[in-house]
């Protein structure tokens, strides 16, 4: 993905008319396709910062740079930035005001003076995308909290923004509703939308975000990757934050010598992977090999001998003796890792689905994304996994079982990438195939 900064701020300061200081000296950067979390307590200035980012408020000091140019607070410039930077408020009722779902989502395109036919096409496409097309004529106040949140998101997505900002997007949602919103955000991110959220949920921010800003007492007191932020005790203390549950569990099992050291797991599958301590062997290594190097297994097949057939997937040099021999950590996996097949529901065919299910090749079936879930529900298919599908699929494959995942759109690439990233980090090889929409064949 091309690195491109869409929005950045330098030394922003904003004070409300009554003299209340909202933020000061705030500098952040938002890049294309990044997932960014602003973490901080209530009253720290997160909501005010969001209103500054799309030009709703104007800072008294500092400036906002939009595509490399200072934001001008005149009609044309504000129109451009508000089309490109959409905000979803914490309370959906503050944002939804039209008599019907359709009219609410159509508000933005109509204000852009789009032709009526184009408005209808965009709104219907967006409502179908978020799984609300069948509710388009309903009054929004008759909807559930999760449905209202989707209406608010749809009203932003229909404008085709580059940046989508969400204030506490998972607050007050039940686990299923929260998972559906998270699926939606991840899919939008696959289309290279920058997603910016505010949250109090440390575990969510740690596992989800690419980059984190800590906003405390109206100032940015720290920024970095989740690994950098949550492994810094001093920064966490200053921000009044605890460490994420995943890290807390890892540290406890590490203290008991039950886990590999110097790892930074972010998910349950990554914690599980730390519980596989390596074996130690001696190998003759050539000059130039250094401690910490990974070895090409093919070059040492003769020395490894039978060990190679026992599922060796990774080697790392721990120490090099003066004799030229090295102590090498050898990581193994047991035979029988399951596979994951992802069926792209953008070309859904019930006959194909029934054939896959009848084959008996799959032990567990999952479904991701609201649109996909509605499709499989309409055909009376009952997936085993509907929440946390990717992590649970990885864990299932590690137990030697095969998984079939139904999903569509950008979630196909998202699932492949997540599983592939796990494989790269862990050294465990899980075969992941996508069912080809054109030929009806699985492709790597």
Swiss-Prot record:
Keyword Magnesium assigned: no
KW Aminoacyl-tRNA synthetase (keyword) present: no
Entry EC number(s): 7.-.-.-
Annotated Gene3D superfamilies: P-loop containing nucleotide triphosphate hydrolases (3.40.50.300)
Membrane topology designation: Peripheral membrane protein
CDD domains reported for this sequence: ABC_cobalt_CbiO_domain1
Gene Ontology cellular-component annotations: ATP-binding cassette (ABC) transporter complex
Keywords associated with the record: ATP-binding, Cell membrane, Membrane, Nucleotide-binding, Translocase, Transport
Cellular compartments annotated: Cell membrane
Protein name (database record): Putative ABC transporter ATP-binding protein MA_0394
Organism annotation: Methanosarcina acetivorans (strain ATCC 35395 / DSM 2834 / JCM 12185 / C2A)
Lineage: Archaea, Methanobacteriati, Methanobacteriota, Stenosarchaea group, Methanomicrobia
